[in-house]
């Protein structure tokens, strides 16, 4: 309403809507016009900042609040605190591990030193027991277990001597075994080797072989002594067993060829076919013959049980002084 009144009052007197006031003075319309201008300016100025504010809010950047800054700072400080605590815990664990490793190394070093000291004391103890107790009392104080070590050494020597004597008894059968035993005994001890050498030599002399004069000396079967396989073979070699076969020459040759392949290992050797000749001339007497030799009586028995002789062939057992 005030604005309407002001506008009505501000109309010029010559306009059709307004009437001329003769009583009024000309100074009043100027004052009213100035007031209207000032009010309109104030309204326009008040509208302009509002428009700029709305434009800034729509398209401009939001101002950062104090609360958001404080929250981000708190988060950063918390993350820094956590990282510091983690680094501290890691450093502590590393220090603990280094301490444990150093402790284990120190304990291992102490153990190795103790073991080396014990081995040194054990290495020194046999010298003390050899020299005697009166000369070195200090070494006794260092190694209190000298008597036990001496006893153990004596027991070991006794065992070694017994093993050497057993080896000498077991190596009577072959020359190679006796030679190997000699080399070992020389490396072990020269004092204990001499009686063992004598025993092994005496035993090997009996089992070396059979002299020509002794062949066929015993015409009995081999006794069941505990002489071993080699001794039994050597005793049976004194009178080797033989089978003599009589028959036609061709049948004997065929039988020999078959037996060499079929009965391998059940005989020692085959002879060729032969025949007796009369003393007055060169005529053959009787049928041809063939000899089959064996290394033992058991081998001859096994051969005789396994072989099937051809028809028209006769057999007979025998022994020879030598083959």
From Swiss-Prot:
Location(s) in or outside the cell: Host nucleus
GO cellular component annotations of the record: host cell nucleus
Biased composition (Low complexity): 20-40, 94-130, 143-155
Top-rank taxon: Viruses
Biased composition (Basic residues): 57-93, 132-142
Name of the protein in its database record: Protein E8^E2C
Biased composition, class Polar residues, residue ranges: 41-53
Keywords: Host nucleus
Family classification: Belongs to the papillomaviridae E8^E2C protein family.
Protein's job: Plays a role in limiting the replication of viral DNA in keratinocytes. Recruits the host NCoR/SMRT complex to viral replication foci to mediate repression of both viral replication and transcription.
Gene Ontology BP, a term: regulation of DNA replication
Keyword Ribonucleoprotein: no
SUPFAM superfamilies attached to this UniProt entry: Viral DNA-binding domain
Chief localization: host cell
Annotated region described as Disordered, given as residue ranges: 1-233
Species of provenance: Human papillomavirus 5
Molecular function terms from GO: DNA binding; DNA-binding transcription factor activity
